[in-house]
C-alpha cells in the first residue's frame, strides 16, 4: 500500500482541480526539501506541510544558503508560515499561504434527538492524542456515548506501517478492551468521508502541533460538533466552531478535561441553537475550504508565478 495521508490526498485534489498543462510548468515538492532533485528549468515550489521543528527539514532551513533554491514556498496555514518565518528568517517575498481543502463530504441528514446514541469518530494517527482520548473515555459516564477509533499507521504506507505500528499495539489493545470504545483501525479516506454522517462528535485531544487538520475540517463539513485542543494550527483551521479544550502537557489532566468536554458536548447536541451553529459551520467550510475554490487559488498563484519568472 502506498501512503495516502493528508499530503497525498491534497496533491490528488490539486491534480484534479488545476489544469495539468499549468502543473507541467512547475515542479512541486511536498514538505521535505530536495527529496526530489531541483528541476533545472521549471519553477521549483516547496509545498510545506510539516511542522518547522521536524528533523527531516529543520537543518535544511537553518542553512540560509538553501533558501534561494526554491522559487516559492507554499504553506498550508498562516500559523505554519509564521513559525518558519520566525525560526529560519525565510525570504517572505517568496512565500504564500494556500490552505488545504475538502471535497465530497456527505453531511448528517437530520438533527440530533434526545435519547439517540452519540457516536464519536477519531481518525487521527495514534501518536497525536489517542492515549489522552482513551483516558477520557474511561471517565465518560453517559451510556449513550461511544467512540469509534480508526487510528493506524497504515495511512502512511506499508513500509512505515511495518516499521512503526508495533509501538502502538498496546494502545490499540487498550481501545479494544474499553466497553465504550470500538477499535476499527485503518479505513481509506473515501470510507471515512462516506460514514462521517453516522457520527455526532469529532473529538481530537491533539498533543501534536498540527500545521492544519484535514480530519477536523472534514468533520466540520459533515456537521459534526468538534471538541479539540487549541494547539498548533487547530484554532486557525476550525475557527470559532468547536469546543476548545486548552492544551496541557499534563496528559492526565488533559484527559479529565476532555471527559468533561465530551459530556458537555453531548448535552449541547440537545440545545435549541446547536443546529444553526452546525449549519453555519458547514457553510463556512464549503465557502472557504471547498477544493473548487482552492483550485482557483492555486491556478491564480501558479499563473502569476510563471508569468513573473
Name each model feature, range by range.
Residues 1-38:
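N-terminal pre-catalytic "stem/leader" segment of glycosyltransferase-like enzymes
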Residues 4-9, 249, 253, 270-306:
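A charged, aromatic-enriched C-terminal amphipathic alpha-helix characteristic of glycosyltransferases
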Residues 56-57, 85-86, 93, 99-117:
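Acidic anion/phosphate-binding donor-loop and adjacent secondary structure
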Residues 71-94:
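A short, active-site helix/loop in glycosyltransferases that binds the activated sugar's phosphate group
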Residues 112-129, 134-137, 148:
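Conserved donor-binding/catalytic core segment of Leloir-type glycosyltransferases
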Residues 161-187:
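Nucleotide-activated donor-binding/catalytic signature segment of Leloir-type glycosyltransferases, i.e.
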Residues 225-228:
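Short hydrophobic beta-strand element within catalytic cores of glycosyltransferases
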Amino acid at each position: 500500500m502506498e501512503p495516502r495521508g493528508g499530503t497525498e490526498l491534497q496533491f490528488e485534489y490539486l491534480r484534479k482541480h488545476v489544469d495539468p498543462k499549468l502543473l507541467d510548468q512547475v515542479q512541486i515538492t511536498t514538505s521535505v526539501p530536495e527529496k526530489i532533485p531541483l528541476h533545472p528549468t521549471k519553477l521549483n515550489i516547496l509545498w510545506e506541510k510539516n511542522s518547522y521543528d521536524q528533523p527531516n527539514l529543520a537543518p535544511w532551513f537553518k542553512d540560509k544558503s538553501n533558501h534561494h533554491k526554491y522559487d516559492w514556498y507554499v504553506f498550508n496555514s498562516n500559523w505554519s508560515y509564521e513559525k518558519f518565518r520566525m525560526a529560519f528568517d525565510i525570504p517572505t517575498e517568496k512565500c504564500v499561504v494556500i490552505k488545504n481543502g475538502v471535497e465530497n463530504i456527505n453531511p448528517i441528514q437530520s438533527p440530533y434527538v434526545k435519547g439517540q446514541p452519540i457516536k464519536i469518530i477519531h481518525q487521527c494517527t495514534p501518536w497525536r492524542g489517542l492515549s489522552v482520548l482513551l483516558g477520557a473515555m474511561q471517565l465518560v459516564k453517559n451510556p449513550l456515548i461511544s467512540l469509534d477509533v480508526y487510528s493506524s499507521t497504515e495511512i502512511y504506507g506499508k513500509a512505515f506501517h511495518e516499521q512503526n505500528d508495533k509501538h502502538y499495539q498496546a494502545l490499540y489493545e487498550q481501545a479494544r478492551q474499553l466497553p465504550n470504545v470500538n477499535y476499527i483501525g485503518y479505513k481509506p479516506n473515501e470510507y471515512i468521508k462516506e460514514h462521517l454522517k453516522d457520527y455526532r462528535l469529532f473529538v481530537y485531544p491533539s498533543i501534536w502541533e498540527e500545521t492544519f487538520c484535514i480530519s477536523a475540517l472534514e468533520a466540520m463539513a459533515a456537521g459534526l460538533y468538534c471538541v479539540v485542543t487549541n494547539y498548533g494550527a487547530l484554532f486557525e483551521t476550525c475557527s470559532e466552531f468547536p469546543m476548545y479544550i486548552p492544551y496541557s502537557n499534563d496528559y492526565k489532566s488533559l484527559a479529565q478535561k476532555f471527559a468533561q468536554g465530551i459530556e458537555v458536548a453531548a448535552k449541547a447536541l440537545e440545545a435549541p441553537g446547536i443546529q444553526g451553529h452546525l449549519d453555519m459551520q458547514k457553510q463556512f467550510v464549503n465557502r472557504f475550504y471547498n477544493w473548487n475554490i482552492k483550485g482557483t487559488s492555486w491556478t491564480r498563484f501558479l499563473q502569476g508565478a510563471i508569468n513573473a519568472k
